[in-house]
Curated annotation (Swiss-Prot):
InterPro entries: AAA+_ATPase, ATP-dep_Clp_protease_ClpX, ATPase_AAA_core, Clp_ATPase_C, HslU, P-loop_NTPase. It is found in: Cytoplasm. This is ATP-dependent protease ATPase subunit HslU. The keyword Nucleotide-binding applies. GO terms for molecular function: ATP binding; ATP hydrolysis activity; peptidase activity; proteasome-activating activity. The keyword Cytoplasm applies. Belongs to the ClpX chaperone family. HslU subfamily. It comes from Listeria monocytogenes serovar 1/2a (strain ATCC BAA-679 / EGD-e). A double ring-shaped homohexamer of HslV is capped on each side by a ring-shaped HslU homohexamer. The assembly of the HslU/HslV complex is dependent on binding of ATP. The gene is hslU. ATPase subunit of a proteasome-like degradation complex; this subunit has chaperone activity. The binding of ATP and its subsequent hydrolysis by HslU are essential for unfolding of protein substrates subsequently hydrolyzed by HslV. HslU recognizes the N-terminal part of its protein substrates and unfolds these before they are guided to HslV for hydrolysis. One of its GO terms (biological process) is protein unfolding. Its main location: cytoplasm. Keywords: ATP-binding, Chaperone, Cytoplasm, Nucleotide-binding.
Length: 469
């Protein structure tokens, strides 16, 4: 990375400004994450002798649910297009117990990283891949007479997916009539006239969904064996009838994959995961050990000890190659209602030197969440009803009342942070969303009286409040 590329990267202040577009408050957390991110760019500029000595300062976020812990990490990864993986600590168990192996978090990160790199490389070969895909599609829509004659297939070839549709060889003669037909199809294809026509294409068979279900039951170790076996035989394919519009996408992806070097893709994916990857470990407080926990405490402490070497830096085998986790940034988060950070084993505590306590949301925060972010909830509901031709208008007093109710319900019952706004707005607009297709009005105004009318009966009944809001 050169000085020029570093100057082109976002500064910590710019990162915080971008986060402000989506997340209200929590400036301390935003600052810490922005600095951690900038330090990764700075590290790339250093001499190799000192670069290897500088490891990311992992972050521990402490705060109740719904205050923005996950959203900060998720948004930061999107802003910088860094590989990002979110896991829940409660999904893991120590090796030998039923559950997911902790190493799977690294494998998930590498999958995301390789996918990001592949998307970028596909854009680089897009023009050529689209041209090749179009040629194949034209041949499918106007096959030669020789192609139409079906040949008996070897049983073993059929078993292992040898169903490829061979294109005409360069030496094969194509008569003038077929050339004219294909030329006409090409013109119509480029003008979108054939987008809704049906064509038969061959696609790779998807992995059996049962295998995905088994992964959750501690079967991550099967991945390597499955990948090794799949490499021994050609990918099994099946014929599918799709529209020309869908066929364009299928054939483009297939042609783009042929133009991308698989080894280079894997190497770059691993490098990016190692140098720029971020793993968000949620609910880490749930595996904090407490005295007198019995077998449950042993299991929780076991998970911590399994996570420790990954956070410290270790070599993890994936289907793309070995990954060094030493320079991956780990962000852990938890509410710590029933435990405290000091309940984590000392070695793990030491691996999260940056501690950030996120603030509880105030009534003013709720108001800002409803109105200020680019993806604010009120803007979302307005857009939903706009599709029905209705202009939804909220008065300032109505929004203030919604914020007040959300804050009050959080105070009186379980505090679920900003997520409370989802339940309140859904209840408030339930009838309107249901009746919208039959309403012959160009605009509807939501006033403070409307909010009180819809929510007051529920607010007055504590039992109903707990169940509905």
């Amino acid at each position: 990375m050169t000085n020029l590329t570093l100057r082109n990267q976002l500064t910590p202040k710019q990162i915080v400004e971008k986060l402000d577009q989506y997340i209200i408050g929590q400036n301390g957390a935003k600052k810490s994450v922005a600095v951690a991110l900038r330090n990764r760019y700075r590290r790339q500029l250093m001499d190799e002798s000192i670069r290897d000595e500088i490891i990311p300062k992992n972050i521990l976020m402490i705060g109740p649910t719904g205050v923005g812990k996950t959203e900060i990490a998720r948004r930061i990864a999107k802003i910088v297009r860094a590989p990002f993986s979110k896991v829940e600590a409660t999904k893991f168990t120590e090796v030998g117990y039923v559950g997911r192996d902790v190493e799977s978090m690294v494998r998930d990160l590498v999958e995301v990283s390789v996918r990001l790199v592949k998307e970028e490389k596909m854009q680089l070969v897009r023009v050529k891949a689209e041209k090749n895909a179009e040629k194949r599609l034209i041949k499918l829509l106007a096959p030669s007479q020789k192609k139409k004659q079906t040949t008996s297939q070897n049983p073993l070839e059929a078993l292992f997916g040898g169903m490829n549709q061979p294109d005409e060889s360069p030496e094969e003669e194509v008569d003038q009539e077929l050339k004219n037909k294909r030329s006409q199809i090409e013109w119509r294809l480029q003008n979108g006239e054939l987008d809704d026509e049906i064509v038969t294409v061959e696609v790779k068979e998807q992995q059996n969904p049962m295998l995905d279900m088994m992964r959750g039951a501690g079967m991550d170790q099967m991945n390597g064996m499955q990948d090794a076996l799949s490499g021994m035989f050609p990918a099994k394919k099946k014929k599918r009838k799709v529209t020309v519009r869908e066929a364009k996408k299928i054939l483009f992806e297939d042609e783009a994959s042929k133009l991308i070097d698989a080894d280079e893709l894997a190497a770059e994916g691993i490098h990016r995961a190692e140098q720029m990857g971020m793993i968000f470990i949620d609910e880490i407080d749930k595996i904090a050990s407490k005295e007198g926990g019995g077998n449950a405490q042993v299991s929780r402490e076991g998970v911590q000890r399994d996570i420790l070497p990954i956070v410290e830096g270790s070599q993890i085998s994936t289907k793309y190659g070995t990954v060094n986790t030493e320079y991956i940034l780990f962000i852990a988060a938890g509410a710590f209602h029933m435990s405290k950070p000091s309940d984590l084993i000392p070695e793990l505590q030491g691996r999260f030197p940056i501690r950030i306590e996120l603030d509880k949301l105030t009534q003013e925060d709720f108001y800002k969440i409803l109105t200020e972010p680019d993806n604010a909830l009120i803007k979302q509901y307005k857009a939903l009803l706009k599709t029905e031709g209705i202009d939804l208008i909220f008065t300032k007093e109505a929004v203030e009342r919604i914020a007040e109710i959300a804050f009050q319900v959080n105070q009186d019952s379980d505090n679920i942070g900003a997520r409370r706004l989802h339940t309140i707005l859904e209840k408030l607009l339930e009838d309107l969303l249901f009746e919208a297709p039959e309403i012959n009005m160009e605009s509807i105004k939501v006033t403070e009286n409307y909010v009180n009318e819809k929510l007051a009966p529920i607010m007055q009944n504590k039992d109903l409040t707990q169940f509905i809001l």
